[in-house]
Amino acid sequence: MNILVVNDDGYQAEGLAILVKALAPFGNVYVSAPKTHQSAKSHAITIKNRIETFVSVPIFGSTATLVVDGTPSDAVRLGLKVFDIDFDLVVSGINYGANIAKDIMYSGTVAAAFEAKILGVDAIAMSAPNTNLPYLYDETIKLFDELIETKLYEYDGILNINFPKETYQRPKGVKITTQGLRLQHAEFVKSEKPDIFHIKGSIINYQEHPESDVVAFDDGYVSITPLKLDRTDYSKIKDILETEN
């Protein structure tokens, strides 16, 4: 099995190291990762500038490593091109910080998985509130034992996996979840220097669906949320057509 690992925290990130080592028993693990931290880059790709890459000494026990001076989605595209082999799976992560609810709209980790799917390769995004969690390596192996055996990722979307909040010593289990509603109120705050702003956010609490990734995260469960590229609101189309008729 050939597996490509990407991330948005950069090629030196601890979460990347854990993921590569955890996937090693399942096949040949290749790495294509950004040179620098790329959080919240979402699905950005580089279109006007050239992208510098270099083949590194294989890191974390990988078969081969490519470092990309670009976005997470750039790293996916270039990894698939430069290595030029048939990959069975792309895994993006392990991200430092959860990617639940609205987070997926901004997440470079989730976008990298979607980019792989656009290019025809099955993909999984994986995130944790903290990559220093003592159980993370063992639980990641346990998850992939099940995922690879069942091939749950083989469909026309991706799987978005999140480990629970770090107040739990270990996950209570795994839940298949929906995307939650948790939103943030974000505003730009002026800094001490003139014309310089930084973003400040606060959580807006909603009544979450009990089967959402937010509830699973808060209750101590690993969440697996199937996500699709198609964002069409079919119920709204139906409403419009019924109104017109």
Regions found by a protein language model. Name each.
Residues 5-12, 103-104:
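Short, glycine-rich nucleotide/cofactor-binding loops
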Residues 137-245:
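Electrostatically charged, flexible surface regions
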Residues 98-107:
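Glycine/threonine-rich flexible loop motifs
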Residues 79-84, 113-122:
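Alpha-helix C-terminal capping segments
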Residues 9-17, 194, 207:
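Short acidic, Gly/Ser-rich segments with clustered Asp/Glu that frequently serve as metal-coordination loops
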Residues 3, 14-86:
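A cross-family phosphate/adenosyl-ligand binding-site feature
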Residues 117-137:
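Glycine-rich phosphate/pyrophosphate-binding loops
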Residues 89:
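Short, Asp-centered acidic motifs that coordinate Mg2+ and/or phosphate
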